[in-house]
């Protein structure tokens, strides 16, 4: 592992000044194949967990690389603690593994298994890397787990897109398990696709995804649900802006009960299709607090979000407008009101990097990235601005239906790969730690 220490000092950007930031560590992980990070979560002791998909360590019956879900733990100092791959089958390019840490330190990972024509999968590890239990959930068709969140009582929620239930071709699902892996309830919002789930401090559950825009073929809005811990729908909203909006970067809840979603907004003109990163914040009552977009001369997407204890917002994503290389990861720091961009930084080398997730623990910011280049990397201030897409929020009389999904133990188990923190080529996962 190589650790780099340097500071970026305040630079006037016309949006306020960038605060001084110190890079603590930057660590790559993987093997000779492709190791793509998709999410990160932090624990109370300052350790962090990065999840994604790797094909570096196993092959199929024909000797071809076989994709597996991975979870890697890094210590409070950024050093590698342990690494695991789930032995079940998964599919690269279908779904994004996600990770959450419960108050007792248990680690939950969701994703997709290729068994049973694709089911959502939920894995529980202890802080030492022992796989405690595993569940596959779904029906007769394809059901993708895309997000996971935990509650203070130890329960865990997964969300994603299900094709097994309802009259439409897909639905946004939310499934609740207890800490022992027992299925508590399962719900679906028909006609939508799921991307995100979060749990507020009062136990309220929020889920988000996309839904077709009425009367506009090919255009999509964000749909947001508030659900009680017992599985009842409290309210439903749709957010509309541009031609297509989505919460691909998932969502996070603030200490005040508000929720923040990140993703992308696409606006199509006669000559171009502009894609910008999108940040949308709602109150616990479903009112719009703000909507902002982060846009340069090319393409930006929001791929991860967390809300700090002071309710400031961190957004991670990918940019082709700013940074040191062809494509870099970025992180934004926003005021709770969205009125001011406190920081805008990029990270990367001379090749291609993507941002996958962001987490906070104490005074440390953790970023999950993927890189195609070996060190050195650059942490740079981005001369970026936020603008208002001026989207609209609508109240929807939604229906949340119970579904007959099945949760089963796939009994696949976990293995210890021989991943390295020395860059091995191709795509590698990376954890970047910055002092807040």
Predicted regions and their residues:
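Positively charged n-region of N-terminal signal peptides that target proteins for export
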Residues: 1-4
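A sequence-level/structural motif corresponding to short, flexible coil/turn segments enriched
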Residues: 19-436
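Bacterial N-terminal signal peptides
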Residues: 6-14
């Amino acid at each position: 592992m190589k650790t780099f220490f340097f500071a970026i000092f305040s630079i006037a950007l016309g949006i306020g000044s960038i605060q001084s930031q110190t890079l603590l560590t930057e660590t790559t992980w993987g093997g000779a194949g492709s190791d793509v990070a998709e999410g990160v979560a932090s624990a109370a002791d300052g350790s962090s967990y990065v999840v994604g998909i790797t094909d570096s360590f196993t092959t199929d019956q024909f000797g071809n690389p076989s994709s597996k879900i991975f979870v890697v733990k890094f210590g409070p100092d950024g050093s590698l603690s342990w690494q695991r791959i789930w032995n079940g089958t998964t599919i690269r390019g279908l779904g994004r593994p996600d990770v959450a840490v419960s108050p007792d330190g248990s680690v939950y990972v969701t994703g997709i298994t290729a068994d049973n024509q694709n089911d959502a999968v939920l894995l529980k590890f202890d802080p030492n890397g022992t796989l405690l239990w595993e569940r596959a959930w779904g029906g007769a068709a394809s059901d993708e787990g895309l997000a996971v969140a935990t509650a203070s009582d130890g329960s865990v929620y997964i969300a994603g897109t299900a094709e097994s239930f309802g009259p439409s071709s897909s639905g946004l699902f939310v499934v609740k398990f207890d800490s022992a892996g027992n299925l508590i309830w399962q719900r679906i919002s028909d006609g939508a696709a799921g991307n995100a789930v979060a749990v507020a401090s009062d136990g309220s559950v929020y889920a988000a995804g996309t839904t077709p825009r009425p009367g506009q073929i090919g255009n999509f809005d964000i749909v947001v649900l508030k659900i009680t811990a017992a599985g009842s729908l409290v309210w439903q909203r749709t957010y509309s802006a541009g031609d297509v909006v989505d919460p691909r970067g998932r969502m996070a809840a603030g200490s005040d009960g508000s929720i923040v979603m990140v993703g992308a907004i696409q606006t199509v003109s006669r000559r171009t299709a502009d894609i910008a990163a999108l940040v949308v914040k709602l109150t616990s009552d479903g009112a719009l607090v703000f909507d902002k977009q982060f846009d340069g001369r090319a393409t930006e997407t929001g791929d991860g979000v967390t809300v700090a204890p002071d309710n400031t917002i961190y957004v991670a994503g990918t940019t082709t407008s700013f940074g040191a290389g062809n494509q870099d990861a970025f992180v934004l720091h926003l005021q709770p009101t969205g009125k001011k961009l406190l920081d805008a930084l990029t990270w990367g080398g001379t090749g291609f990097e993507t941002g996958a997730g962001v987490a906070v623990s104490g005074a440390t910011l953790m970023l999950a990235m993927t890189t195609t280049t070996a060190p050195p990397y650059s942490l740079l201030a981005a001369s970026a601005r936020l603008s208002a897409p001026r989207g609209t929020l609508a109240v929807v009389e939604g229906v949340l239906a119970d579904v007959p999904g099945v949760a089963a133990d796939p009994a696949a188990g976990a293995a210890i790969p021989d991943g390295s923190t020395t860059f091995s080529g191709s795509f590698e996962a990376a954890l970047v730690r910055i002092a807040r």
